Amino acid sequence: MERVRFHGIFCDDMHTMHALEDVFPIPMETGVVETSFRQCAAAYDNLLAAGMKPFVELSFMPQHLAKEDVRGMFFYRPNICMPKDDQAWIDYIQSFVRFLIDRYGQEEVESWYFEVWNEPDLPVVFFHGTREDYFHLYEITARAIKEVDEKIRVGGPSTSGSKWVKSFVAFCKEHNVPVDFVTTHQYAGDPLGGVSDQGGPESAEETAVDEAMKEQMSNVSPEAVQQMFANLPKGAILPAIRSFMGDPLERDDVPDNVFRTNAPIVKEQAQGLPVYYTEWNNCATFSAYGNDTRKVAAYDVKTILALENVIDGSSIWCFSDIFEELHPFPEEFHGGFGLMTQSGIKKPVYYALEMLNGVGDMRYDLGEDAIDNEVGMAAFASDEGTQCILFRQKMKNNLDLPKEEAEISLEMDAAPRMVYMERIDQEHCNPLKVWEDMGSPQVPNPAQAAIIIEESEMRAEELPFVYEDGKVKMSVALGVNDVYCIRIVK
């Protein structure tokens, strides 16, 4: 992991702008407003101290700069409006950039990426405006940054579902707007129709979806709300949320190839600009039970293996369950997006990435269909030998299906010294099962957390093999969404 991206560096709880009437209950606007980036510095100081760099997401709008007081739907209620005064926003952005340069040095800040906003294509959720509004916001922001330091990299449009890229790049070229890279997001299932942006004004399809979302969120009657939430389970919030949100990937038939299909299209639409998927993962539904299972591990491994040579960088959303879009859940396992729980317990997807991080730099060409099917494999070479990543990936956790036998055969000049494997399956690297087996303690005490970590940590175990006729042969049985790493030591 080299860079960290997060929402809300300009949210009001970061205290970047305060007026006198925020401090004292003065019933008027005094015009006394101060700007401070002290808490922004605290966040970036910690990242740099950990050996990482920020991928700066410029979001959201400080209330004192906002055109309206319209808040996003999530728990932290960001202001999602355009600025009421372009010049005030420009001055604010330039003050921020100058602060960063003064604190960290010009060369350091020039090594960062600055991404304008987050998912402006999602009305009600993240942006109160049109696509044209966002393009204007991007233009004034990018120009403001470049006026301070033309070497600082800035990009967008940071959309969901691989959208707006073609029209965004066309806008920047037509109006000579600075853009150094393209960003977008993609979760499985959004949008199922693929990339719809054709470079012109908002399509009728996209406009209809946006308007329907606004209508649905803004004009729900009190009676409909009462009916929707009449029979919620009482007590904890998590069961209540799950009762009406559910797990779409278990409920619906969602294809597994939307990201793999859309990324090459976006790469072409970017017209040579670097492409970064700054958010992606298996499921976009926070609280879905499957987010804590090995289903995410299998999907992410398959996707990474398919796209490593297509895009320039990506960020799985997100690193930790310390994440408050739907409030800080008390349950240790609550379907969060994180690779780790709030207590630092590693989930199956963490171990899957650890497997990938441990393979050699040279990847063998096994053919185009090696990873396209339910059972797939990739092989790598290092000085120590050969590593094979195997997976059995399905969008649903059909754990009652019989295991699939996978036989591996590799040509080698001599018998290997040893063969061992690491595996993610029902009994290995499965902290959710350990937690549930101990009674699902809401907040595990230190001793319980230590047990979960110990019993679910990834372990190497010897794998029997046969060497004959210049080939080493072995076999494994893969359950649904299992991931194996086989290491053949020369």
Enumerate the predicted regions with their spans.
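Carbohydrate-binding surface patches
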Residues: 372-439, 480-487
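Aromatic/acidic polysaccharide-binding cleft in carbohydrate-active enzymes
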Residues: 277-401
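A structural motif corresponding to the C-terminal end of an alpha-helix
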Residues: 42-53, 99-108, 141-152, 262-275, ...
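Active-site-proximal cofactor/substrate-binding loop regions of enzyme domains
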Residues: 182, 255-266
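Mature N-terminal, pre-catalytic/accessory segment of carbohydrate-active enzymes
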Residues: 1-2, 6-7, 480, 490
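Substrate-binding clefts and catalytic carboxylate motifs of secreted carbohydrate-active enzymes
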Residues: 287-326, 414-454
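Substrate-binding cleft and catalytic face of glycoside hydrolase catalytic domains
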Residues: 2-252, 285
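C-terminal beta-strand-rich structural cap/linker in extracellular carbohydrate-active enzymes
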Residues: 443-490
